[in-house]
């Protein structure tokens, strides 16, 4: 049981774990020199320092800590003692922390070399480090997390210090969020207040690997350094619609001498100075606001700065250029568009442009990224199923088809008022289509995101549509306001018989929505031809959150006139098909990277309006994200908001095939990447219109990209044939 502190005047309520071990532990944050093979760099041998620190809760692959608070009753703000990490992800993938309050941890959560951590909807007071990330090689996510002294101070627990004395300590000693190497970290709605360093970004101890990341709605205040950037990898940091505020005498942002790459700010407010001692690189500011600086808003001693449509609150002392400054370019920036520069550089190239013809619409604010009320069945009634299944750490597959029994149980639950049908952990065989009735949820053992490797509740199938093939009904059909949660799906016969990894079996979509407000949450596709069909019916208000896996030809396709839907935290990567749980557990092992890169369309949007596409990622696809005319309604994509989308290893990372005059796609923090794919001679980050002078994309159709990053091996950066 757990309650959010901010909803209870800061009080810590519900389940509380009292930690009375580890006080003054000598190995509270120990590490040893070690070596590892980097799968992201051709298995190159790396040298690093691996944590061997003690920890209170060790989180291995496929684990979650949810709905509780953790408190150290013997900690004393007047005599602070170190304790081991409260939560520690050791290795592997998929460690989730959700609805957790760390009342007064010394060190909060450590993600050691691993993948796919997810910290969300949680609160932390940490006396040394709140969250620390090391060598995350597949998308880590931090979402809606608050780190502040107030959660201990206002907890109502015995021995809690005053907010003033606790803040004095954390501002002198503590770091809120510390990120070493992380490949494509997604950080959103992170709030940090009252720390010596709010966010620290930099290298791994012992070698030069650093992170790239995107930050959205990140707000830091009252810190000596709101954001401290030691170094960033060549792909850069994107920061949008955020704010960084300094304590008195501090810096809103500081760049250390090792910084030499790229950091992009868009729609960011700064309270206090930005200081850079970086050796080179580019720092760009677009639609930013600079305020509350006593000396200079920007003190740049080296490198390159770009200013676009930025406002400075003070009339002077906007930019100080140090001796080794290389370039300053400004467009429509300054106080009332008058930019004041104190130039001490040897030979910096300075270009100032003030002209209305270069004015543009700034990044939109207040974008909605999540649903107000999360979907759930209409009743609290839970029915636990007891069907034939395979269990254990072996390679056995289920042999009895439970389709009829499962459908009967779902129908009976509907008849009794709706609710949840719970499938305990194990592997179930479902070889005929089932329909989840309105108001009913089919739920497995997973309460958090998970990988094929983690086992749990799984539905295995050989269903391929029979004579109708891929056009037959879907295996799992969701009626209006029906959902599926916490289950893994596996198409057993995808490469059996006459089919192979080069030519896998075509099947219907595994899941189909057949009405409004359908939902799919924490579902993994271990292997399947097609994922979720939200295009054949109007599924307005649909909600998909953390669909992981490896669909081969189609991921999530949306259309049918749907309005107001959400697709969030999609995570597609071919390794879901080749990393199996202990003992194999009957899953087919398939390596499909080459096939998906030439055949998959991961995300497809047709006749939809007011769609929210948030923090999704696909590795390996022809089209990472694809917009086109609806085959059923004949209508075009409408207005959509896309925040934090990542396409990696794709032929075309973003493809607008069809669009009319009302199509408007707003994209923020996009990371669009091509790799050199065999048999794909033309590749580009963006393709708008498939052919030159195409009539399928209206000249007034809009694709608006704010704060984007592009890298890889394109033939052309962007191919714009219309719009």
What are these regions (language model features)?
Residues 2-78, 98, 143-145, 149-167, ...:
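Extracellular "leader-to-stem" segments immediately downstream of a signal peptide or signal-anchor
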Residues 1, 20, 66, 71, ...:
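Feature marks extracellular polysaccharide-active and adherence modules
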Residues 15, 43, 61-66, 85-86, ...:
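The right-handed parallel beta-helix/beta-solenoid scaffold, focusing on the short coil/turn
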Residues 74-80, 85, 105-112, 127-135, ...:
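Short glycine/acidic-rich loop motifs that flank beta-strands on beta-rich extracellular proteins
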Residues 30, 328, 417, 634-635, ...:
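Short, flexible coil/linker elements and helix-boundary hinge sites characteristic
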Residues 177, 395-399, 603:
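Hydrophobic alpha-helical scaffolding
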């Amino acid at each position: 049981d757990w309650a959010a502190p901010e909803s209870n005047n800061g009080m810590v309520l519900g389940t509380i774990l009292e930690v009375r071990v580890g006080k003054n532990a000598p190995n509270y944050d120990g590490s040893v020199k070690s070596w590892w093979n980097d799968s992201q760099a051709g298995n190159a041998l790396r040298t690093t320092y691996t944590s061997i620190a003690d920890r209170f809760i060790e989180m291995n692959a496929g684990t979650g800590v949810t709905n509780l608070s953790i408190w150290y009753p013997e900690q004393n703000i007047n005599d602070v003692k170190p304790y081991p990490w409260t939560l520690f992800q050791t290795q592997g993938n998929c460690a989730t922390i959700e609805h957790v309050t760390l009342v007064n941890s010394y060190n909060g959560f450590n993600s050691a070399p691993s993948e796919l951590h997810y910290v969300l909807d949680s609160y932390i007071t940490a006396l040394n480090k709140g969250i620390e990330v090391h060598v995350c090689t597949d998308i880590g996510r931090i979402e809606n997390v608050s780190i502040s002294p107030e959660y201990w101070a206002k907890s109502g627990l015995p021995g809690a210090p005053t907010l003033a004395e606790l803040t004095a300590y954390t501002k002198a000693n503590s770091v809120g969020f510390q990120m070493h190497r992380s490949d494509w970290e997604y950080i959103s709605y992170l709030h940090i207040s009252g720390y010596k360093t709010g966010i620290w970004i930099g290298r791994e101890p012992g070698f030069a690997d650093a992170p790239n990341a995107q930050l959205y709605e990140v707000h830091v205040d009252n810190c000596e350094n709101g954001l401290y950037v030691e170094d960033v990898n060549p792909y850069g940091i994107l920061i949008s619609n955020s704010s960084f505020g300094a304590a008195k005498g501090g810096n809103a942002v500081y760049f250390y001498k090792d910084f030499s790459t790229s950091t992009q700010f868009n729609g960011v407010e700064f309270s206090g100075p930005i200081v850079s001692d970086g050796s080179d690189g580019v720092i760009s500011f677009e639609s930013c606001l600079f305020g509350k600086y006593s000396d200079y808003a920007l003190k740049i001693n080296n490198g390159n700065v770009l200013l676009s449509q930025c406002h400075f609150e003070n009339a002077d002392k906007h930019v100080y250029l140090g001796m080794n400054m290389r370039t300053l370019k400004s467009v429509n920036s300054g106080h009332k568009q008058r930019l004041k520069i104190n130039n001490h550089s040897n030979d910096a190239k300075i270009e100032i442009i003030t002209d209305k013809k270069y004015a543009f619409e700034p990044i939109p604010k207040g974008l909605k990224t999540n649903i107000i009320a999360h979907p759930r069945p209409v009743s609290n009634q839970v029915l636990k199923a007891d069907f034939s299944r395979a269990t254990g750490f072996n390679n056995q597959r289920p042999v009895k088809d439970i389709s009829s029994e499962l459908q009967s149980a779902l129908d009976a639950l509907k008849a009794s008022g709706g609710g949840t049908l719970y499938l305990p952990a194990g592997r179930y065989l479902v070889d005929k289509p089932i329909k989840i009735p309105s108001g009913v949820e089919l739920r497995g053992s997973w309460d958090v995101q998970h990988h094929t490797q983690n086992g749990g509740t799984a539905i295995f199938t050989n269903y391929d549509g029979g004579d109708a093939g891929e056009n037959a009904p879907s295996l799992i059909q969701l009626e209006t306001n029906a959902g599926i949660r916490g289950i893994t799906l596996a198409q057993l016969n995808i490469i059996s018989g006459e089919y192979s990894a080069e030519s896998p079996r075509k099947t219907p979509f595994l899941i189909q929505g057949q009405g409004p407000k359908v939902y799919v949450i924490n579902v993994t596709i271990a292997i399947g031809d097609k994922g979720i069909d939200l295009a054949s019916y109007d599924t307005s208000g649909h909600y998909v959150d953390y669909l992981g896996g490896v669909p081969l030809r189609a991921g999530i396709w949306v259309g049918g006139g749907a309005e107001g839907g959400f697709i969030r935290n999609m995570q597609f990567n071919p390794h879901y098909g080749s990393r199996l749980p202990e003992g194999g557990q009957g899953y087919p092992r398939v390596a499909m990277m080459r096939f998906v890169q030439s055949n998959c369309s991961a995300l497809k949007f047709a006749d939809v309006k007011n769609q929210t596409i948030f923090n999704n990622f696909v590795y390996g696809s022809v089209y990472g994200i694809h917009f086109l005319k609806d085959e059923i309604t004949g209508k075009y994509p409408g207005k959509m908001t896309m925040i934090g989308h990542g396409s990696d290893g794709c032929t075309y990372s973003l493809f607008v095939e069809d669009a009319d005059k009302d199509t408007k796609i707003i994209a923020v923090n996009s990371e669009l990447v091509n790799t050199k794919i065999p048999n794909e001679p033309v590749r580009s980050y963006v393709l708008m219109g498939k052919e030159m002078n195409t009539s399928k994309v209206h000249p007034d159709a809009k694709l608006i990209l704010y704060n984007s990053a592009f890298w890889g091996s394109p033939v052309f950066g962007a191919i714009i044939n219309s719009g």
